[in-house]
A protein has these predicted regions:
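Short beta-strand-loop
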Residues: 268, 308-332, 367-373, 391-394
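Von Willebrand factor
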Residues: 269-324, 345-346, 350-362
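N-terminal, polar/Ser/Thr-rich
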Residues: 18-60
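Intrinsic-disorder/low-complexity signal
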Residues: 868-1015
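An acidic, Ser/Thr-enriched
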Residues: 95-139, 143-148, 154-278, 382, ...
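VWA/integrin I-like adhesion module and closely mimicked acidic/polar interface patches used
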Residues: 333, 362-417, 475
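Alpha-solenoid helical repeat scaffolds
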Residues: 741-745, 775-779, 809-813, 852-854
Length: 1015
């Protein structure tokens, strides 16, 4: 038989054509790693990939790939580069190295949370280590800093990947090439000879071919000054029915068997007449994704009934399509917008069971769900598309029935839909253990991995119903030296465990450490100096022999580490108690003996908040619907103005005993002044007016113009306005899809016109924009909370708590949202969980700088919730139980006025300023006012909260503003998004609150929040 191999040098596909069989598809181009500058100046050139080297070694049905990348910085100052790279489905990172002082230093596997915390602590010191971590699905990322001025930095990423198999059993390996000018590009590929594997065919490198060298086929290519226009492909056509590989590493022998299942004798199942189509219409879906999915839809029966269920952040009402044409038309008119929530989809599927054949078209990237979900008994067949995807999660969700359109044509996919393949039932044989691959679909080619425990083993694959493969003999004496198969086994096990990473964290960590695998539970980190390895108690790689010896000699004993940790914990708790006692002392006697009248000057010349009605938003205190000030987000660098107050950042985290609050909150003169004030009822009569903000961006103006064109009368009803506004939003989205500000601004507009469902959909795009970005997720959740969308906000905040468990703010945010939902719904479960999270934020001995002040705020809020709960009439036995704590902390500090300001960016300083009715200003340099106003600790390191407290508020207008002072964050992604919550009669039965979210565009930006009027 003569085969003709043709590789198409394009970015999408390479096709293997055979004369007597259907073409076998080699997967589309896998995106190559990309590097981008972080916080560049407008006049700077971006960092770039200068050289790119790939070494690949095929072993059986797998390949190990080492990619070495040199990134260059053509600018006059050091820059940071962010490297992002999706891998093939089923691949795992198994090695990472960074050049340190010109020497490549291997990364070591560390628990993911520990690695990230260590990395971020070093970032704050201005000396970045190297970190590579699994994001979600096949997405990985790393950061490179510093890339020296007019210099370069080298990183290395190793991964192991299964070969891509076409339905006819042919195999291929695709090595992604960046489409950028390279000073040097080198490619080295090795394929073993034997086992019936034919001579491989090389593509993407012109007329270069493999050459035989000893027991392998080898190709080595080095090009200079080249711009790749195609990926490098290695095709293994006409693969034998069975391919076996055996490797030896240390004292273990690992094997892989790749087998073509026996042909099914059963007749093809006819396609049904009724279908359920689950269509992922989230914002991350691309035109290419839809085109590939539509190719399958177009092959479904025309005369059939289709139930179309569109899902994003929420599931839409099902639509019935009487023909395939109606279905296609409906899909053509379905916008791609919003986040993805598989939990919502699974809830729909369970609540609306069907016997109809169900197809799920998606990439599997669940950005809003809270974890593992289950479709119940009738699991769908997933049709997967997308460059970034989560095949492992989909296989678990769908019982293994996943069709990857990167590996199959639409017609081949239809055959699988019409006659679903059986699964591999088992593997038979003595002398083998730890077999991976059981349960996979038996189509095209089936691959299993395992460990050989004896000298020899005869292995047969069981396809069920008495169908067994021919025996494959595995011999220890045939083993080559190598780690590919052992690492591939570990990667396969990790992929199996990853969809339930929280439940399998210990095993994932053990596998990661033993086999060097990055997973949802593990990352790889590289430090530059010995003290960093010691500080974070991370063992250096054995390959750095001298460093490892110094670390071993210098490392404190386990007893010493435990003692130091206990001393740190006790010191933290002692400081917490001292500061809480100072807070209570202020509350008992809030008037200072010696008032200080300095002013910041920020209120001078500021437009009065009683200005034009377009700039005002006065709403009932019951609601949390303040309009957001949204300014387009863009990358920013440290401002020169920041250095003028750098001393504020350099202060020690722990305050000295007897600081301003503790030392000046009492005195007879304070009592005398308070006695002269007019009597006022316990609960103040107050109103709050928040300052609405119109960002006046071109996209919002276009939306408003479209709505204005409706005119008046019947056309201007709420439904028509929302429909026209959303249509124009979709037009603008094509231009601004990458801008977080766009979604925040537009969501604010839709909230403003009472189109809440559309607003929630729009804001949920933030979760799709940057996977697992806690700042972006916090912003999204805060805006949802502001709108009263607690369920959606809580799902995101639970994810943030998993991403940032070392930050008290994660648990305080969760507690606040549970608190508010619990009060609204009179939910004992929510109230109890809120109390538990307040308690965690308050009494954990956090290591984070300024965590102490978040803890104090959490104690205030915990006591307020306990008091509220005590006033409710709960069903007998259902009253939420308050967590146990020292009696010294059980004190309700109720207030006439409380204002809390929090923000979403770390290492960033935002200040709260309040101008009291008598003209005295409370701010970080004047914390205690003569009438008893109290500004809490100045948080300069990010997140807040900062508070203004007023126990007994004199009558008058209190003006509030936020000032964006500066940031020392090296990689500031954009302006700070702040949320202000204004309370009156806080902690009392008639407590009222109002929330406003806004974004501060640039350093020194001062923004009016609003007025509090006490009557």
């Amino acid at each position: 038989m003569k085969n003709v191999i043709a590789f198409l040098s394009c970015c999408m596909a390479a096709v293997l054509v055979a004369q007597d069989r259907e073409p076998a598809v080699v997967p589309p181009r896998q995106p190559a790693p990309t590097i981008r500058s972080v916080s560049p100046r407008a006049d700077e050139r971006p960092v770039a990939i200068a050289s790119y080297a790939v070494e690949a070694r095929v072993a059986g049905a797998f390949a190990s790939v080492r990619t070495s990348i040199t990134v260059s910085n053509p600018n006059e100052r050091p820059l940071e580069g962010a490297l992002e790279f999706p891998l093939p489905d089923g691949a795992s990172v198994c090695g990472y190295a960074l050049d340190v002082n010109g020497v490549m230093t291997d990364g070591v596997v560390v628990k993911k949370e520990k690695a990230r915390v260590a990395f971020e602590e070093e970032v704050k010191k201005g000396v970045d280590p190297g970190l590579v971590e699994h994001v979600q699905g096949n997405a990985y990322r790393t950061r490179v800093y510093p890339i020296p001025a007019n210099g370069a930095r080298q990183i290395r990423v190793d991964y192991v990947t299964p070969l891509a198999f076409a339905p006819n059993g042919d195999a291929a390996l695709v090595l992604a090439m960046p489409r950028v000018p390279l000073k040097e590009r080198s490619v080295s590929i090795t394929v073993p000879i034997g086992g019936g594997i034919p001579q491989p065919v090389l593509g993407g490198l012109g007329d270069r071919r493999f050459a035989q060298a000893e027991a392998v086929w080898r190709s080595v290519t080095v090009d200079t000054d080249v711009t790749p226009d195609a990926d490098v492909t290695v095709a293994l056509p006409a693969m034998p029915e069975r391919v076996c590989a055996v490797e030896r590493v240390n004292d273990e022998t690992w094997f892989a068997i790749s087998d073509r299942p026996p042909s099914l004798e059963t007749a093809k199942t006819s396609l049904p007449k009724t279908w359920r189509i689950l269509w992922d219409a989230s914002g991350s879906r691309t035109e290419a994704d839809v085109k590939a999915a539509r190719a399958v839809i177009d092959l479904l029966p025309d005369e059939a009934c289709y139930e179309l269920v569109v899902f994003r952040n929420a599931v839409e009402k099902p639509r019935i399509c009487a023909t395939r044409g109606e279905l296609a038309a409906a899909l053509d008119n379905t916008p791609r917008d919003g986040g993805t929530d598989f939990a919502a989809l699974a809830a729909f599927a369970k609540g609306n069971p069907t016997e109809n054949r169900t197809l799920l078209f998606t990439d599997g990237m669940d950005v809003l769900g809270e974890g593992d979900v289950d479709f119940g008994a009738n699991k769908p067949i997933a049709v997967m598309t997308g460059a970034t995807k989560d095949g492992a999660a989909l296989r678990r969700l769908c019982g293994g029935r996943v069709i990857d359109l990167a590996l199959q044509t639409a017609r081949q996919a239809l055959e699988e839909i019409g006659a679903p393949s059986p699964t591999l039932a088992g593997v038979r044989g003595d002398g083998i253990a730890n077999v991976q691959g059981i349960g996979q679909l038996a189509r095209g080619r089936v691959t299993v991995l395992g460990r050989l425990t004896g000298d020899n083993a005869e292995v047969r694959l069981d396809y069920g119903n008495g169908r067994l493969s021919k025996p494959a003999t595995i011999r220890r004496t045939d083993a080559r030296e190598g780690r590919t198969l052992a690492t591939a086994w570990a990667a396969s096990r990790v992929n199996e465990l990853s969809p339930r990473a929280d439940d399998n964290a210990e095993e994932l960590l053990a596998i990661g450490r033993r086999y060097g695998i990055t997973s949802p539970a593990t990352s790889m980190i590289v430090f530059e100096r010995l003290d960093q390895w010691l500080t974070h108690d991370v063992e250096p790689p054995e390959s750095a022999k001298e460093l490892h010896e110094k670390w071993t000699a210098s490392r404190p004993s386990e007893a010493q580490r435990r003692q130091a940790e206990e001393q740190r914990r006790q010191k933290y708790l002692a400081n917490l108690k001292r500061e809480w006692e100072a807070r209570v002392k202020w509350w008992n006697d809030p008037i200072p003996p010696k008032p200080k009248p300095p002013k910041s000057g920020l209120f001078d010349g500021l437009r009065r908040l009683t200005g034009s009605p377009e700039r005002r938003s006065s709403v009932a205190m019951e609601a949390a619907t303040g309009s957001a000030r949204n300014v387009e987000r863009r990358d920013m660098e440290r401002s020169a103005s920041y250095s003028a107050r750098v001393d504020r950042f350099s202060r020690a985290e722990e305050p000295p005993a007897g600081d301003e609050v503790a030392g000046s909150a009492a005195g007879s003169s304070a009592q005398e002044r308070r006695a002269k004030e007019p009597a006022k009822p316990k609960s103040a009569a107050a109103t709050v007016t928040l300052t609405a903000w119109d960002p006046q961006t071109p996209y919002l103006q276009a939306i408003k113009d479209a709505v204005k064109a409706l005119g008046g009368g019947a056309n201007a009803n709420a439904a028509n306005i929302a429909e026209v506004a959303y249509a124009e939003y979709l037009v603008q989205r094509k231009k601004y899809a990458a801008s977080p500000a766009f979604y925040l601004d537009c969501a604010g507009y839709f909230f403003g016109i009472k189109a809440k469902a559309l607003a929630v959909r729009v804001i949920s795009n933030l979760a799709e924009l940057r996977l697992d970005d806690p700042g972006m997720l916090r912003t999204c959740a805060w805006r949802l909370r502001e709108a009263g969308e607690y369920d959606a906000a809580l799902a995101i905040l639970r994810k943030v708590a998993k991403l940032r468990p070392e930050e008290p703010h994660s648990f305080r945010d969760l507690a606040i949202t549970l608190d508010e939902r619990g009060r609204r719904d009179a939910s004992a479960a929510d109230v109890a969980e809120a109390m538990a999270n307040y308690h965690k934020a308050a009494f954990t001995a956090w290591k984070r700088e300024n965590a102490l002040w978040t803890a104090i705020v959490s104690i205030e809020e915990l006591n307020a919730l306990i008091a509220w709960s005590g006033r409710q009439k709960w069903p007998e036995g259902n009253q939420p139980k308050a967590p146990e704590m020292d009696a010294a902390y059980r004190k309700l500090l109720d207030l006439d006025v409380r204002i809390a300001l929090a923000w979403d960016t770390d290492n960033t300083d935002v200040d709260l300023h309040v101008l009291e009715p008598d003209g005295e200003e409370a701010y970080y340099q004047h914390k205690l006012t003569s009438t008893g106003g109290f500004m809490t600790h100045d948080i300069t390191t990010g997140y807040g909260p900062e508070e203004y407290l007023k126990k007994d508020a004199p009558k008058g207008v209190y003006k509030v503003l936020a000032n964006y002072f500066g940031s020392r964050q090296q990689t500031l992604l954009g302006p700070a998004t702040v949320t202000a919550t204004v309370f009156t009669n806080w902690g009392r039965a008639d407590e009222r609150r109002q929330i406003l979210s806004m974004r501060l565009e640039k350093v020194k930006d001062k923004v009016p929040i609003g007025d509090v009027t006490v009557k």
